Amino acid sequence: MRYRHYKGGVYEVVCEAILEADHTAVVVYRGQDGQVWVRPREAFFGTVDVGAERLPRFAPLDPPSR
């Protein structure tokens, strides 16, 4: 599934995983440039304050599959 970062970049979720060190749930995702990133699941699906607005850090671009 693809998501748009609040700063404008588009990313595709590769998978969700568990961090070995402390069992934190993480999201593995890839940018359009091919760079792979890992972020705690709570942060990936969390919100950010931008000016007076609270926005999702990553907003879904693709409709949910049924």
Regions found by a protein language model. Give the residues of each.
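Mixed-charge, low-complexity intrinsically disordered regions
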Residues: 1-66
